[in-house]
Amino acid sequence: MPSVVSPQDHLQDDAPAAQLRRAEPCLWLNPHRQPIPAARQAVAGDHISLDDTEKAAARFARFAPLLEGVFPELQATGGVIESPLLPASSLHAAAGLVAGQGALWIKADHRLPVAGSIKARGGIHEVLELAERLALQHGLLTPQSDADDYRALANPAARAVFARYTVAVGSTGNLGLSIGVAASALGFHAVVHMSADAKEWKKQRLRQRGVQVVEHAGDYEGAVAAGRAQAAQDPFSHFVDDERSLSLLLGYSAAALHLRQQLRDAGIVVDAQHPLFVYLPCGVGGAPAGITFGLRQVLGAHVHCFFAEPVQSPCFMVQMMAGQGAHPSVYDWGLTNRTEADGLAVPRASLPAAELMEPLLAGCFTVCDDTLFRQLVQVLDATGERIEPSAAAGLSGPGFLTGTETGRTWLHAQGLWPHLAQATHLVWTTGGLYVPPEAYARFEERGRALG
């Protein structure tokens, strides 16, 4: 077990920690990462494996006929919730890459239907898992049920069963959208506890779909705690716990299976001579941890995942630096947790996610809000894609890795530098599809004003 280290201990000999405390962009590399991932990984007193990821993917597949009927936007995909893999060579300079440092791609979760963000993966999976469990309990499904049986869960009899139950969640925005929209569409009573960071348009989108929005004056941690406490008083309430849920995490992990096929279809090889670097925005940590777990299980030693966080809200970097046995907050480091990247405005990381990532994660880096807005505009100008500020966080990753002494030293130490020209850099964009035009116009205006 790594030692528990306080912020003060770090400041004396750890340059990234000193930069972090000054709210300066920095790169931290994980000294506990294992090159070869174990087949079974410990998390929250349990163990998970590729088998659990495949079970989550199978659940999505079973529910596809129902989802196709409930959500018109899924008719074209047969009920499959997925995002494209986009080439992004026009963003090389914006990402800090120069010629000979690999190819750049975008995993465009900002286009995910239904929820419009990466949260469609984990959030909808947990709602589906709950619906399946209740349907089995009430005789609406059997283990032998076929597509027609799942499609019938949209019928009045099934909706009457689901209507007895409440699905609740605490969120800064995107997870609330995912849970609220999916739960209400199936007939559940949906309650979303929103922190002060949540954008007004996200609250309105939920209310328009019949979701109860409870606004809190405090931060993400407070909204989650309030939602958890309220749900605990009602035996017919299911609380989706973003800080602790394995169902969420495994729902995210299923993305790795589809990405593996997308990489093959694009002719992208991932092996010792062709490393894959993945850059994932990180809030409490469940989504990027789930995806990283899935990718390490599927692609093994040759995928290297990095989490991106705002300079004022680096809760995961703080947690990874401290190690197991501690649970620090960004406030402990003199940081404010104030950022325009609302989905990343989290003061304290998920402990299960941090435990899972200790042997799997390559590192973390932080970015300024101004950088997010500049890069949002660069993405628009280069590709035409419209993303939220938080979705731009990963774009700084390649530059940290290839353009800083810390990053280059790590690449050499890992034996990756000689293979950089054959590498693939994958920036995972996390939200943007449903941003109202007037809100996006303000994002763009700020980004262009920054130059």
UniProtKB/Swiss-Prot annotation:
It catalyses: D-serine = pyruvate + NH4(+). One of its GO terms (biological process) is isoleucine biosynthetic process. Its EC number is 4.3.1.18. Gene3D superfamilies: 3.40.50.1100. It holds the Pfam family PALP. Coiled coil: none annotated. The modification N6-(pyridoxal phosphate)lysine is found at K119. Keywords: Lyase, Pyridoxal phosphate. One of its GO terms (molecular function) is D-serine ammonia-lyase activity. Its cofactor is pyridoxal 5'-phosphate. Belongs to the serine/threonine dehydratase family. DsdA subfamily. PANTHER family: D-SERINE DEHYDRATASE, THREONINE DEHYDRATASE, MITOCHONDRIAL-RELATED. This is Probable D-serine dehydratase. It comes from Acidovorax sp. (strain JS42). The lineage of its organism: Bacteria, Pseudomonadati, Pseudomonadota, Betaproteobacteria, Burkholderiales.
